Amino acid sequence: MSWYEKYNIVLNPPKRCSFACADNLTTILAEDGNNIRAILYSQPKKLKILQDFLATSRNKMFLYKILDDEIRRVLT
């Protein structure tokens, strides 16, 4: 018997971003484009995370069309 067999890990299923969550995110991105642009360029890992998030969450509830033009350009 291996030492790791005694561990039991139970993960809760991931929660989908609610409408309010998505609305808050897009509002922040739309209002503070210069700061977000600087963050994206200075932290490529966060840019990759945001790209992955947008790729998996594009649905009718996430209004990504209002993103700053520069962020939209970087993400596409």
UniProtKB/Swiss-Prot annotation:
Pfam families: Pox_A3L (PF05288). It comes from Vaccinia virus (strain Western Reserve) (VACV). Interacts with sulfhydryl oxidase OPG072; this interaction involves formation of a transient disulfide-bonded intermediate, allowing disulfide bond transfer. Interacts with OPG088; this interaction involves formation of a transient disulfide-bonded intermediate, allowing disulfide bond transfer. The gene is OPG128. Disulfide bonds join C17-C21. Belongs to the orthopoxvirus OPG128 family. Induction: Expressed in the late phase of the viral replicative cycle. This is Protein OPG128. The keyword Disulfide bond applies.
